């Protein structure tokens, strides 16, 4: 029996489904986390062979000892994953220490975690990226900003999501940022006038996709977080050919095997000198894990499938055992803010869209910053219905 160590299997909450499908496929699933065992969801407990509680997942020595214990008790560890951006570097260090060769090792991490290091691999794939500079201080950042022109975007070179990401519009903005910059290494990039589309896939051990999807984010996540805007995005009914082509090239250039990926691209809204023509695809960043939040469930809603099983099939059999010839839909996400009054209140939304509502729920404050306080997910068969849904749900009272 193969041993699979799942780091932090309780977060996100839906990750128990990965564990369940691994168990169904005959793997011994061993969990490591800092949540007390009796506070784990029953569904997770039912699908873990054993759980090792540490005081803190931030304490590497504790987690190392947990993996060592499982190795002593059950033999060689075949897989170790968290499927979580925050722990990717930790995962790779543990794989390296315990010679677990089924995933990225410590030596691989710069190219998949550092935004500056990703640029060379996008170039290898033949995909352009925004010009950039690693910030040392005000003078060098100012020189770069004047070279490419404002606005510019600054963000941690090793960051997650839109955290500490800012659009700077003038020298004064840049000075303020430099004066208040934390200890992170920051990358400054030319602003790209585009919207984000993704290539999301489960890649097998041969570097081939066994599941493909993508999502479109009409509004910048940076603006959603920094301006407290409504959050909207959707799973595509059919993946655009140019996004698929860019995704496949990126997978090959980065040497991706045996994992879920969420690869982000800009699609230019207009011609941009030095980057390309309107609708050209530009590399943004790679994420070597599933797209966050509710997205895995939204794939399932959109394609009437089960990505938790497809991923576990990849782990166990290096192939998909499901019939993928199923109806396909758009699946649209809207996250609304409690601080705003909307034309359609909560009950009106449920009344109008109950027929196609797949999920609605409240989010805790920790997640609401990026996703909204109240979220709704609906399936649609046409883009017109999808866009009307977005307009209706984010229209403010009196507009």
PLM region spans:
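ATP-binding N-terminal substructure of ATP-dependent carboxylate-amine bond-forming enzymes
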Residues: 1-105, 320, 384-398
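C-terminal structural cap/anchor segments
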Residues: 278-282, 288-337
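Peripheral (often C-terminal) accessory segments that flank ATP-dependent C-N-forming ligase machineries
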Residues: 312-399
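Short, acidic/small-residue loops that bind anionic groups at enzyme active sites
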Residues: 102-114
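Phosphate-binding core of ATP-grasp and ATP-grasp-like enzymes
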Residues: 180-185, 190-233, 241-281, 287-296, ...
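Active-site nucleotide/adenylate-binding loops and adjacent lid/helix of ATP-dependent enzymes
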Residues: 111-193, 205-208, 233-245, 391-397
